[in-house]
Amino acid sequence: MKITQIHTNKPQSLSFEIFPPKKEEDFKNIDEMLEILCDCHPEYISVTFGAGGSSNNNKTIEIAKKIKNQYNVEPVVHLTCLCYNKAEIDEFTRQLSYEGIENILALRGDRNPNVPAKEDFLHASDLIKYIKDTTGDQFCIAGACYPDIHPEAADKVDDIKNLKKKVDAGAELLLSQLFFDNNTFFNFAEDCRLAGINVPVIPGIMPCINAAQIQRMVTMCGAKFPEKFQKIVHRYGDNKAALFDAGM
């Protein structure tokens, strides 16, 4: 089922995002993690995808297959484009189609210093349009959005303008990057509506339970980290159990 239909049927839906393990020996633990997540009855689970040359990309599709076939939950496959050409993207979409996977989160992807960017896709909107043009309505294509503004955007207006390009290219809904202030998201969603972005905007939430992980994600995506959460991390950062209780 396409996730647009899921959100139509059940507007308040739970989903998770997971990262394929980098080490082969950790891959055997994926079932244990999926069983825990699926006990929460998510409507879908998204699986991240590496930049060009990442060995995790085959694992992404393998995990997505497992989510769909073994756990009967809809997978959403992240697909990056900066380090891939059209032929490579065609191969990925063929694999997804063969496995019956209907949902893609189309992303530019982070720059990889070890793999040069290619010329076919410079922006996520380029990838969205290409998938839409080459596959029609076969996939539900989602785009990413940043309530705290994309770190490379000149300002909020520039960010919303680029986001509108994704929707005009064919994105059917938007999945947000993490944020820690609900008002930031509400204001962002209203800005989207005022700009004529009328697709669903789905909030992305990251529990404050791992100090190092939070710092890494905040630095990577430019999210604002409110003082009240900084105090939680400062007070409980050295005690995993206490930070988990306080952060949740």
Where are the predicted features?
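N-terminal amphipathic alpha-helix/helix-capping segment at the start of soluble metabolic enzymes
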Residues: 1-16, 23, 132
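Glycine-rich, positively charged N-terminal anion/phosphate-binding segment
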Residues: 3-4, 27-35, 40, 52-73
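Hydrophobic faces of well-ordered beta-strands that scaffold small-molecule active sites
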Residues: 12-20, 43-47, 75-79, 104-106, ...
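Active-site mouth loops of central-metabolism enzymes
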Residues: 13-29, 75-87, 142-158, 234-248
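Active-site-proximal loop/turn and secondary-structure-junction residues that shape catalytic pockets
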Residues: 18-22, 49-53, 75, 81-83, ...
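Glycine-rich, proline-tolerant flexible connector loops at the mouths of alpha/beta enzymes
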Residues: 21, 42-63, 109-119, 172-188
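Glycine-rich anion/phosphate-binding loops
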Residues: 81-95, 121-123
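Active-site pocket-lining/capping segments in soluble small-molecule metabolic enzymes
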Residues: 119, 123-146, 194-248
